[in-house]
Amino acid sequence: MTAEYSMLPRATLTRSGRERMPAAVRGRTAEIQRMIGRCLRAVTDLKGLDGFTVRIDCDVIQADGGTRTACVTGAFVALAEALALLKGSGRLEKIPLLDTVAAVSVGLVGGEPYLDLCYEEDARAEVDLNLAMTGKGLWVEIQGTAENEPFATEKMSAMMGLGTEGIERLTQTQRIALKGLRLE
């Protein structure tokens, strides 16, 4: 199971070039693709996919905030829909999902935690944190960086708490979107 991540040329304030060949995949893109893939594999019974390769396309059309975390959340919905289609066609005996997964970005701006920072907030952030969690509340991915100065454990706890709340809301939205698929 893998994911391909790409930002369309006008997804950012200034146009960026396309990454056309696999050899041209830049470090940031490769890192994001690996993160998305790890998150999806963490909630999938890979033995239940025996004989199948699943590739999820994550195309960013507007990059104003946490694109990698938005891709994790959306990629899970796409995966669930694809697996439900395979089960519905008789190609899978059951849907091999163990749980849901969603992700958010959290930042520290002016000493305060912010959820899902926009570009301007991200540019001012003292700390950048990406969090991915299962629907059962288990951590899949925690990536964090202090931009200029170290930060206290209390600030990390506040960001993790805010991130958890955001992920719980996204998980509910995923469940609503996938309600008719009978994923059990």
What name fits each language-model region?
Residues 27, 47-48, 66-70, 80-84, ...:
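A structural signal for small-residue-enriched, beta-sheet-centric alpha/beta enzyme cores
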Residues 1-3, 50-54, 100-102:
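A generic structural signal for short beta-strands and their flanking turns/coil linkers
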Residues 1-49, 139-156, 161:
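Glycine-rich, flexible beta-strand/loop modules in the N-terminal catalytic cores of phosphate-handling
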Residues 6-8, 61, 109:
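Beta-hairpin (beta-strand-turn-beta-strand) motif
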Residues 31-39, 50-88:
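Glycine-rich anion/phosphate-binding loop at the beta-strand->alpha-helix junction
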Residues 3-5, 56-58, 106, 131:
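Preference for bulky hydrophobic residues occupying beta-strand positions
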